[in-house]
Curated annotation (Swiss-Prot):
Belongs to the arrestin family. PalF/RIM8 subfamily. One of its GO terms (biological process) is ubiquitin-dependent endocytosis. The gene is RIM8. InterPro entries: Arrestin-like_C, Arrestin-like_N, Arrestin_C-like, Arrestin_domain-protein, Ig_E-set. This is pH-response regulator protein palF/RIM8. The lineage of its organism: Eukaryota, Fungi, Dikarya, Ascomycota, Saccharomycotina.
Amino acid sequence: MAFIKLLRKTKDEPSRLAKAVRHLQVTLDDPHATYRPRDVLFGQVLLDLKQNVANVRVRLTFIGEVKSKYGTAHKRGGCFMEKSTVLYGDDGDLDTDEMEPTVNGLTKGVHKFPFSIRVPSGKKIHSSIKFERGSVSYHLMAVFESVVEPEGVSAKVRTKVNILVPIDVYRYSDVVVKTILLNSNAKSKSHKINSNDHNGHLNGDVTTLTTSDGSSEGTKKTISESQIINNLSQRQVLQKSKSEGSKSESIQASTGQINQLPETSSQVSYNAVLTNGMNRDADNQTVKIDVRLPHSGFVQGEYIPLTINVSHYREYYHPAGVIATLVRVCKVASGRKEDTKEIYRKDICQSISPLLIESNKLENTISTYLKVPNDIIASMTSLPEHFTFQYFVEVVINLSRKLEIYSHSQKPLSYILEKQKTKKPLTIPRDLKELNLPASVNENGAWEVPRPSLNNEKSNGGIDSSRNDFQSKFGSAFNKSTLFGLKNIDEIHVAEQTIIFDDMVDVERLKRMRNVAGLSIETIIGNKRSSPAIDLAKLEISKLSQGKVMKSNGTSKNTSSSGSIESNSIVRYRYISFEQDTQSSTDSYDEDITKMGNQLNEWLSPANAYEEYYPVPEYSANENVFASEDKQELEYKRLHELESDPPQF
């Protein structure tokens, strides 16, 4: 009987708790904020009970979920992160006997449980995203359950949390240059093959691949013409990828990760020969294409400047000779044993430039721009079992005479070029347009408007107010990191005019034409660009070592007896230390660090500065500032000081 009674109690416990809950809610102090790893979430769990309950527990769980959709019906996903804590009650289960003990309880009414939980960090944390084929989401789940029967959850609620994992693109700061050489089929003797076909069709193919170490490999195949076309379509152009300061070179097909051309594509009339730039023969009729990127990593909202150099063996012109496209490639995995993936390509933006090769130069350098949108998804390759996001800058060189170029909506080339010309101009801020103030980028990288002279001021609040308004509105948007060398409004206007974001040229269709070559460069799209840390101690050593030279030129600033330096001189010393070679000063760093003593500024470094630590300022507590106490506590003290009522008899 005792066992049946206990069983009846455990079965009725979840239903009884479910009826006792009137409302359960999780609220964050800042619900619309975007949190990063190691940030602290502050909030509270609100529980409204209809009646008294005993042996209960309130649990808070931080959950990370991923979902993906392969094909039309195959959906999969799961929880890749789950960290929980108990806000009320015991974490363990309760061992019950015949007489059920009471370990805790909550009375009828509203109960608030404040919490603070730190966002996890590491490789298992990913940014929150949502797109057509999947999502990564985070939630805070509050659960009200019984200690006696933990599986019987009476109430639970979720609230969404936005997580942004910083992707620093500073380590992708090397210059990227890719070069391809295109040899003419008709003039190149190395590609001529004797054929027994009476119709004059090409029955053989020889491809010479020269790598950076000077070795070459030649292959000869006797196959049909359709097989040659299929072979050439799959390896249209071989790319050479090199980065300044890097010793490794990678060789891949220009359409290796982006394009999967069909077998019926036309034959390109240029066979690609990858070369290291040293064995190019000037007598050969070749076309050389160089594409240069100043960085391989860019932040959302930045411009991507491209420098494209085309060397031709004869004069040539095409109104759409160079087409640069920022491409996003999403790969969705199936999760099956065969490891099949669906590839989705999306053109983000595009720039069309004319190609003009004059007879006297036989080469042309084109400078064009692409722009990374602010709301774009950052690069993600940390979830290959579900989906990945990669970005490429694809440059297509149109060497054909045909103007059969169409957009995705089947609009001709004339419509695309006319739309590019009639694009709305960039809105110039009022400070630059009406007041005609020259804007520039200062040494700190900020977009600023110089302060006008007092003679031009009409009133005390006229130009100053508009200048401050410009600084507050556009100072963070237009900075040196975003512009990448665009230091005036004219260059920004040109960059904006050449970029197309909708109804772009169908590059996949264009590359199926004859005499069209293309290459792609993988780029990293992030959301952060950190600057290198400046060692202030080395900066001061460099300044002290150059002090005699500056005094001899009469450019030194007078300092006070305490060693303080004006702010203008600090900026000048910093500029000089960047421009001049500081190798000699850094080599003697170990010797000079012990001789500095009191020569450094007191605000810049403590007296016992160590070599491995950056100098930090010292602060003392302000004894004149008192923190105000709680109003209820002050009211309690005030009432306590009053005289008490006389006792009543």
